[in-house]
Design a protein with these regions (language model features):
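ATP-dependent carbohydrate kinase catalytic cores
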Residues: 66, 91-122, 216-245, 250
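Glycine-rich phosphate-binding loop of actin/hexokinase-like ATP-binding domains
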Residues: 114-184, 189, 276-278, 284-297
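Short coil/turn connectors at secondary-structure junctions
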Residues: 54, 89-90, 123-127, 136, ...
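Short beta-strand-loop/turn "lid" adjacent to the catalytic site in phosphate-handling enzymes
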Residues: 48-94, 99, 103-112, 129, ...
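ATP-binding/phosphotransfer module of carbohydrate and carboxylate kinases, centering on a glycine-rich
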Residues: 1-53, 169-333
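Short, acidic Gly/Pro/Ser/Thr-rich loop/turn segments
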Residues: 12, 64-66, 135-139, 194, ...
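Short glycine-aspartate micro-motif
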Residues: 2-6, 54-58, 93-95, 119, ...
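Active-site nucleophile and cofactor-binding loops and adjacent substrate-binding regions
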Residues: 34, 74-76, 93-100, 119-122, ...
């Protein structure tokens, strides 16, 4: 049995898999709020109760990983492969969550994707993965024989680059608050809430009472804003989502240029699949608006990842590899 985990800033997912004929077969799964636990051990201790056939474990974590240890950017506890191995007595791997997602792409089927731009995939070209949720994750997908090999990064924390006068004002506002302003400050769930407050101030329009109530009830403006934008019930919410999608597309284009991702760009995370009508409307135009390289970017395929099990599947695949070489103490794929 293989233990796979996806540890994000909001949710912690665990699953048990078996490998049959080279294919991963899921046997059991659970999802928890990450904040419920002080350590990863607290989470998988109950989940694994009575399970005595474990062969290996692998976890994707939202944050940088060094020497098998992750200090999650939006996760309160650290995760160490050596500690997991000592605890469970099996090979253990800890990797960045975007790396896990990158490995998981090969486990998906065509129905797990929504095509934003069909383009012309270069069979020898690199790819790129960008994922917006609680944070903004980015990975480069190096092309090797047999598919992509993901290289994790923390590109979401690179400096935000405004494209027009309004976004310069946005940068000024956020710089007063945070000092350094990263792309994650504007392209993420918390970033969506930030953009909404900026757009509300910019518009000069008062917030409708019904919207104030819904935001207070939800405790988070982001899902309320996206729902109102989809329903076209508030113009400021619509402008907020338009800017969010445009910024998301712009940074995806930046990543595509850095990776020379002629093999395709994959858009992950929870925000894009839940807002597909809005993403279809403005993502590609911002993605390809790169001056002299607009033609190159226009030929790059773009797909939204619809399957939220991608990271778990990637972790399970790496766990299967670790189980096949048990003599090693696994800390990286």
């Amino acid at each position: 049995m293989l233990l796979a985990g996806d540890v994000g800033g909001t949710n912690l997912r665990l699953a048990l898999f078996e490998e049959e004929g080279g294919k991963l077969v899921e046997r059991r799964r659970a999802r928890f709020a990450t904040r419920e636990f002080a350590t990863l051990h607290d989470a998988f201790d109950g989940f694994l109760a009575g399970e005595r056939r474990l062969e290996a474990a692998a976890f994707g974590v939202a944050g940088p990983v060094r020497h098998g240890r992750a200090e999650g950017t939006n996760v309160a506890f650290s995760i160490d492969a050596a500690e997991i191995r000592a605890d469970l007595g099996v090979p253990a791997v800890v990797m960045n969550d975007l790396e896990a997602n990158g490995w998981g792409l090969a486990e998906l089927t065509p129905s797990d994707f929504e095509v934003l731009n069909r383009g012309e995939a270069d069979p020898l070209g690199n790819g790129a993965l960008i994922s917006a949720g609680t944070g903004l994750g980015e990975a480069i997908l190096f092309r090797e024989a047999g598919g992509f090999v993901p290289m994790p990064s923390e590109g979401g924390h690179a400096s935000f680059a405004p494209r027009n006068d309004e976004e310069i004002e946005l940068l000024k506002t956020l710089r007063l608050r945070h000092g350094h302003v990263s792309w994650e400050r504007v392209v993420s769930g918390p970033g969506l809430s930030t953009l909404y407050r900026f757009e509300r101030t910019l518009s000069g329009l008062p917030e409708p009472e019904w919207l104030t109530r819904e935001v207070a009830s939800a405790g988070d403006a982001a899902p309320v804003v996206s729902r109102a934008a989809l329903a076209e019930t508030d113009p400021v919410c619509q402008r907020t989502m338009h800017r969010f999608v445009s910024l998301f597309g712009a940074e995806a284009g930046n990543l595509a240029l850095k990776a020379l991702a002629t093999g395709g760009v994959f858009v992950g995370g929870g925000i894009a699949p839940r807002n597909l009508p809005l993403v279809r409307d403005g993502f590609f135009s911002a993605f390809s608006a790169k001056g002299r390289f607009a033609t190159l970017l226009a030929r790059i395929p773009i797909k939204v990842v619809l399957n939220d099990s991608c990271a778990i599947l990637g972790a399970a695949r790496i766990a299967a590899r670790a189980a096949a070489r048990p003599a090693r103490t696994e800390v990286t794929p």
